Amino acid sequence: MKYSVEHRRIWFKGEILDINDAKINIMAPTSQFGLNVFEGIPCYWNEEEKQLYAFRLDDHYERLMRSIKLIQIDCPYSKEDMKKAFIDVVRANEYDENLSVRQTVFVDGFGSWGSEGPADMFIAPVPKGRMSKEYNKKGLNCCITSWRRISDQNLSPRIKCGANYINSRAGQREALRNGYDTCIFLNEFGKVAEGPGSCFFMVKDGKLVTPLLTDAVLESITRDTIIKLAKSMNIEVVERTIDRTELYTCDEAFLCGSAMEITPVLSVDKYVIGNGENGSLTEKLHKEYLDAARGLIKEFKNWVTPIY
């Protein structure tokens, strides 16, 4: 049977249960110190095939296992365990719509910030409450935040953990207070890094340009997807260091991530990007992204995992 959002089924500590019945100890290290790592895994409904596809599921687990290793959590689950639990809980909800599925490995018990365990996991599917195409057409007015992106010298941005998002929150709150939609971070060297939960791309002279992975950015699966899609479309992709002022004079720009997909940047620090609208290349890439996520591109069919 299908469940309401308020009573959807989640996978929690080895069981599938009502989300309201999942309880975590308030003194657990995950509650007190943010000791957790996670993935936001998108699923897309293919209406023609009546099939729900998880997008790049194995790649998300590869990254999750890297985060677990770097944070040093003693996780009792293998990638195969995680994948089975993921499919089981999404099936249990009988979803026939687009989803974002939060899969989190956390440190439970009564330990401190130095504890490796006991560790456990929850998987919570969340229906996407908006039509991606309409949302992504609106675009974003951004600022360069005064906060610098965390670097590999303190807490690496390549780790997808709850604690890292405090840095993201600082930049996002500053942007909202000053009337912007979101922000773009510079790294410790004053070069362009990424958004608070998204990677940055710009279009300059017909080329798609994005910061290097060593410029303090997440090893983003969406970033990798866009690079591969662009190359398949014969678009030249350049990974390099980007100066702040290049943002103000680029032809197009967008932020991307599993949740926001590909969302155009209309302005940065009130400098209008291009003509202030969704750029043609950005729009083409977003369409290609959605087609790939729904299993419609033969070349990238291996990126999708059927749920039913």
Q: Positions of the model-derived regions?
A:
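Helix-start/capping segments and mature chain N-termini
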Residues: 1-77, 81-88, 112-308
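Short secondary-structure junctions
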Residues: 91-99, 235
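Residue-level recognition of the N-termini of beta-strands and the immediately preceding loop/turn
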Residues: 99-101, 140
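Short loop/turn motifs enriched for small/polar and acidic residues
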Residues: 104-108
